[in-house]
Amino acid sequence: MALTRPVRLFSLVTRLLLAPRRGLTVRSPDEPLPVVRIPVALQRQLEQRQSRRRNLPRPVLVRPGPLLVSARRPELNQPARLTLGRWERAPLASQGWKSRRARRDHFSIERAQQEAPAVRKLSSKGSFADLGLEPRVLHALQEAAPEVVQPTTVQSSTIPSLLRGRHVVCAAETGSGKTLSYLLPLLQRLLGQPSLDSLPIPAPRGLVLVPSRELAQQVRAVAQPLGRSLGLLVRDLEGGHGMRRIRLQLSRQPSADVLVATPGALWKALKSRLISLEQLSFLVLDEADTLLDESFLELVDYILEKSHIAEGPADLEDPFNPKAQLVLVGATFPEGVGQLLNKVASPDAVTTITSSKLHCIMPHVKQTFLRLKGADKVAELVHILKHRDRAERTGPSGTVLVFCNSSSTVNWLGYILDDHKIQHLRLQGQMPALMRVGIFQSFQKSSRDILLCTDIASRGLDSTGVELVVNYDFPPTLQDYIHRAGRVGRVGSEVPGTVISFVTHPWDVSLVQKIELAARRRRSLPGLASSVKEPLPQAT
């Protein structure tokens, strides 16, 4: 037994040595054996590094010339001379922003032109006299606003249609001069009509309906100097002070020829029979997209029912049986405008006027988007407010609007700025009416350079002195973004204007991607154009 074990072991070794091995080649006796000088694991690491270097992107050649979109990564820049096709897909700078790894990324939509679209194509020969305005109205305009010399594009299209007695839907970008486009024809029409004092309660002949007290004060401030020169009395009717204040406002004598009112206050006055709309000759819904929202729609419907809207221009000829001419004005319009007009007027009597840049990204305003974590927003805002780069300013120093999505955020952020010794004003809808009075006027007079506010300050308010808009909370809709961004770059602004938006949530990123794609294609923002261009339904 002891001798058999070595024999078996020897036979096993012989089999292993004589058996062919996979992957081995027979070498000649003179061929040297390979020598391993680098460990196999280290050699694999070197090969992986070399493959990574080969796969690195090639350096981007930056071509000279202005940019339309400038991103942190140069390969995502888009030159100003390039426009994407409607169906052409392109890598977006915000493509991966829903990932946490995208934090601190940023891109900007640069200025494509220096002038606002509303004044860029003005003819040197155009004037308000060419639009059909009477000399008395032209003289009043010269006295009230001597800086207004030429009509804007919107005014040149709107004023003649209103003078012909047409109902008008005017949809144009913010800051394009829409207020004067309806005030001047309104006042001229009232000059040619007698005042009927047959009612024991106030009965204005012109009504301008606006969504907020601040906007009512602003429109009244524009209309009063014009009316004073023409012998017409302009007053406002605001809510928030109770019925006693409404009765006091309406009891003032003589009664107003033109009334600028908010829906809530006017609805209360109509319900209490403190005012009549039977002699109305002109009805304007300013910021109509807001007035047709669910929060105001029931009130506006009631006001329209109490107004005698003319079916066409022929109904406006009888001065002793007054009918109202209807005007809807706004920078954006919701769906259903046609259905609303069909309830009160003939579709054939309505003229729709839209500007070429309606619902488009403003080409003369720089817009920057920052992808931030929620906890970093306060530090970034404080840095922006304390270190605004004055070297880039081409004009006088402007003011800053900081938008938040809720009143509580405005208050909380105000305490933070107080801790940093940053002087500011606050404006939000939950403030008592007595506190809100005069806040925006103080901001316009530059008593403070910074205003923290909600969207109450984004609708229609004149802000020609605003240089910077900061969206601390990104707006929930594209309509809100258009209105907020429209606080800068307005007609008559002395500063070019910039918008900075903090992007935090995934739903914010979805809106930013729509904005970026529209800017790269130079097209209007999606989901807005159809609400204005839809045909009016035929009466049944």
Curated annotation (Swiss-Prot):
Where does the motif Q motif lie? 126-156
Domain named Helicase C-terminal: residues: 377-536
Annotated residues for binding of ATP: A172, E173, T174, G175, S176, G177, K178, T179
Q: Where is the Helicase ATP-binding domain?
A: 159-351
Task: Give residue numbers for sequence motif Mitochondrial targeting signal.
Answer: 3-18
Q: Which GO terms describe its biological process?
A: mitochondrial large ribosomal subunit assembly
Q: List cellular component terms (GO).
A: cytosol; mitochondrial nucleoid; mitochondrion; nucleolus; nucleoplasm; ribonucleoprotein granule
Where does this chain carry the motif DEAD? 286-289
Motif location (Nuclear localization signal)? 520-523
Tissues in which the UniProt entry reports expression: Expressed in all tissues tested, including brain, placenta, lung, liver, skeletal muscle, kidney, pancreas, leukocytes, colon, small intestine, ovary and prostate.
**Which UniProt key words apply to this protein?**
ATP-binding, Helicase, Hydrolase, Mitochondrion, Mitochondrion nucleoid, Nucleotide-binding, Nucleus, Ribosome biogenesis, RNA-binding, rRNA-binding
Q: Which SMART domains match?
A: DEXDc, HELICc
Q: Which reaction does it catalyse?
A: ATP + H2O = ADP + phosphate + H(+)
Q: Does Endoplasmic reticulum show up as a keyword for this record?
A: no
- What quaternary arrangement does the UniProt entry report? Monomer. Found in a complex with GRSF1, DHX30, FASTKD2 and FASTKD5. Associates with the 16S mitochondrial rRNA (16S mt-rRNA) and with the mitochondrial ribosome large subunit (39S).
What family does this belong to? Answer: Belongs to the DEAD box helicase family.
Descriptive protein name? Probable ATP-dependent RNA helicase DDX28
Q: Which organism is it from?
A: Homo sapiens
Highest classification ranks of the organism: Eukaryota, Metazoa, Chordata, Craniata, Vertebrata
